[in-house]
Amino acid sequence: MENVHLAPETDEDDLYSGFNDYNPAYDTEELENDTGFQQAVRTSHGRRPPVTAKIPSTAVSRPIATGYGSKTSLTSSMGRPMTGTIQDGVARPMTAVRAAGFSKAALRGSAFDPLGQSRGPAPPLEAKNEDSPEEKIRQLEKKVNELVEESCIANSCGDLKLALEKAKDAGRKERVLVRQREQVTSPENINLDLTYSVLFNLASQYSANEMYAEALNTYQVIVKNKMFSNAGRLKVNMGNIYLKQRNYSKAIKFYRMALDQIPSVHKEMRIKIMQNIGITFIKTGQYSDAINSFEHIMSMAPSLKAGFNLILSCFAIGDREKMKKAFQKLIAVPLEIDEDDKYISPSDDPHTNLLIEAIKNDHLRQMERERKAMAEKYIMTAAKLIAPVIEASFAVGYNWCVEVVKASQYVELANDLEINKAITYLRQKDFNQAVDTLKMFEKKDSRVKSAAATNLSFLYYLENEFAQASSYADLAVNSDRYNPSALTNKGNTVFANGDYEKAAEFYKEALRNDSSCTEALYNIGLTYKKLNRLDEALDSFLKLHAILRNSAQVLCQIANIYELMEDPNQAIEWLMQLISVVPTDSQALSKLGELYDSEGDKSQAFQYYYESYRYFPSNIEVIEWLGAYYIDTQFCEKAIQYFERASLIQPTQVKWQLMVASCFRRSGNYQKALDTYKEIHRKFPENVECLRFLVRLCTDIGLKEVQEYATKLKRLEKMKEMREQRIKSGRDSSGGSRSKREGSAGSDSGQNNSASSKSERLSAKLRALPGTDEPYESSGNKEIDASYVDPLGPQIERPKTAAKKRIDEDDFADEELGDDLLPE
């Protein structure tokens, strides 16, 4: 540095002068030779008190310089005075007492806190008074708002009663709030928005709970208060309530008042009110006014609902031209949805494909599908409604609708309309025209071809033309392999041919394509039932019952399967569910009676058989059981009415009239029994049983006709015997050929010998009454002699007071018949 000179030596100011000069106190090389320093290191002599135990804080107030610090001088080992000490009793300046940011608290070991956060929040300037009126008003207002919110939440959750209670509570507290606010502040400070929300919520909850009078009163309070702005709109709500009450004139009045108070800038709200007015006009039958309302809506803001209602109104007045124009307006309503091509990937870009897959079934796409389905439903319904009336014939009307649809954005609906045209032909029982219409689709695209072939297959199936049905079912399946209806029809044709296993496979495939195809599920249950796979059949019908909870057919099938599985208790339980759905089904009631009868519960069986008889008094099996029940319970006179009805239903069956006569005889009305037997003999002169009873009654009563009837009886029995011999000989000679000629009395009484009593012969006749193979038989009918044997035992013989001796029955067989009585 001595050889480098950046400025002339003659310069008076040397920039580097004194650079090499330094205080000898900083010379660390001489510390080893410094006696004072070494002594201070080895001992505590001259050591300064520790002041770095904690970081000093700047948040403590600055100490006063005078008379507060230490008065002694602290000297370092080098003899240099310590910073901040007072030397020789001379007071130093105040700014030199301590370093900036430090305080006396540092000497006590406090933490460094320059922002003063350890002291906490600043104390309030004034203590909070919770009992002040303003604070009470604020708390009460907060509580009212909470109650209104809770009321709305309860309403959205479906708890209407709780919502109304919360709304009432909010109304009560709001009135208290208004009174307190009036006492504390001026009336201008009242919270009108809170009052409006409380009253409006209360009226809404009243309306939701169908308390319409209270709701109207609350709305009136709001509407009449001029301080509420836009309260006139609530007249729409009042009109809705009057509409629910069917007070249509007042509803229209309030709708129009609301329409007058709503400015024209609120176009959407005005359109909705006009739509309500149009619907109210329809309900009152004022179709012309309704047409005007809907036409105005269609000119301002066309919509599907307004267009459909316009068509209905025009149809009601029968105006063909207006119906056509309204249909065209409905077709022209814009759907405002994206085309299906948007959801088809134009390239192999994975990012684009992923995006399309994400939006293919999102909420917007679902909404578009629903809107399109609703539009198609409205158009199809309107076309089916007006097609038969807009032209001279429904076929011409359908053709006009099809042409209009083809020229619109709903081109695919034209084929559906054609199929509906075929169905209309079917309703008119014009089978050939329906078939011709459906055959037109054989050259169309696969979807339409499959639908048409499915209908044709079903039509031929109903006509029992199973070959044609199978052919068109194959065509439908080939056109659309995933058409569950086509597969079901194919299964039906196979089922009709008796191939149940193959039919089950078609039904299974239909269910794989559409698990909600109830027809296939029902048919597969029937198929399993035919195959005697009852567990699988029951499983199918139980699945179907989960889908169709109130289907009588499904309930009946489940009950029948349990009956086949010999579980009568379960069968009874399901039949009880069935009659809860169709309480007037006589077959279900009679089946319940049969099951209870098989279980031995006669009283329950009688109850359900009697209910079945009330709903269908022409069921012979039920009549037969009821008659046998009354005979079994020894009320023969009550059984008469049932057997008389049976004789009216089957007048050629002699057994019912014999039962009536037998009931008269057992009830002690012998004269009526005699008259009945005579009437039976007049209608059926060759009936042996009737003649036997006539002989018996005439003998008991002592009438002179006994010989006449006895002679006829002998002749009939002899003829019957000769006929049987002739039949037997003919059978022996011809190898068992049977004769077709039979007596009207039947062969059941001819097997008795002459020694048998008349009661035994009658018992044998009556045992056939409740046949053993009938579905509605009484469980004990095989042992009950319903007409011929008295359940209490043989009748007591009448006293023999007649002068004439009784003729023994066995004498009939001992007498010889003349040649004139023998058959030719």
UniProtKB/Swiss-Prot annotation:
| Superkingdom | Eukaryota
Q: What is its main location?
A: cytoplasm
Q: Which GO terms describe its molecular function?
A: kinesin binding
| Record's compositionally biased regions (Basic and acidic residues) | 721-731, 797-808
Xref: SMART domains: TPR
Cellular component, GO, one term: sperm flagellum
What does a knockout show?
Cilia absent or reduced, virtually no cilia of the normal 5 uM mean length. Conditional knockdown in preadipocytes results in loss of cilia. Mutant mice show a significant reduction of gonadal white adipose tissue and total fat mass associated with reduced serum LEP levels.
| Annotated InterPro entries | TPR-like_helical_dom_sf (IPR011990), TPR_rpt (IPR019734)
The record's tissue-specificity note reads:
Testis.
- Localization per Swiss-Prot or TrEMBL: Cytoplasm, Cytoskeleton, Microtubule organizing center, Centrosome, Centriole; Cytoplasm, Cytoskeleton, Cilium basal body; Cell projection, Cilium; Cytoplasm, Cytoskeleton, Microtubule organizing center, Centrosome
Residue spans of biased composition, Polar residues class: 748-757
Coiled-coil annotated residue ranges, if any: none
Alphabetic keyword roster: Cell projection, Cilium, Cilium biogenesis/degradation, Cytoplasm, Cytoskeleton, Flagellum, Repeat, TPR repeat
* Location of region: Disordered: 1-27, 111-134, 721-824
**Composition-biased stretches (Acidic residues):** 809-824
Task: Please tell me the disease that this Swiss-Prot or TrEMBL record associates with the protein.
Answer: Defects in Ift88 are the cause of recessive bilateral polycystic kidney disease (PKD) with collecting duct and tubule ectasia, and a liver lesion involving biliary dysplasia and/or portal fibrosis.
Could you tell me which PANTHER family the record lists for this protein?
INTRAFLAGELLAR TRANSPORT PROTEIN 88 HOMOLOG (PTHR44117:SF1)
Q: How does it assemble?
A: Component of the IFT complex B, at least composed of IFT20, IFT22, IFT25, IFT27, IFT46, IFT52, TRAF3IP1/IFT54, IFT57, IFT74, IFT80, IFT81, and IFT88. Interacts with IFT20, IFT22, IFT25, IFT27, IFT52, TRAF3IP1, IFT74, IFT80 and IFT81. Interacts with IFT172. Interacts with IFT57. Interacts with IFT46. Interacts with IFT70B. Interacts with C2CD3. Interacts with ENTR1 (via N-terminus). Interacts with LRRC56. Interacts with DZIP1. Interacts with CCDC38. Interacts with CCDC146. Interacts with CFAP53.
Role description: Positively regulates primary cilium biogenesis. Also involved in autophagy since it is required for trafficking of ATG16L and the expansion of the autophagic compartment.
User: What's this protein's name?
Assistant: Intraflagellar transport protein 88 homolog
Q: Source organism lineage?
A: Eukaryota, Metazoa, Chordata, Craniata, Vertebrata
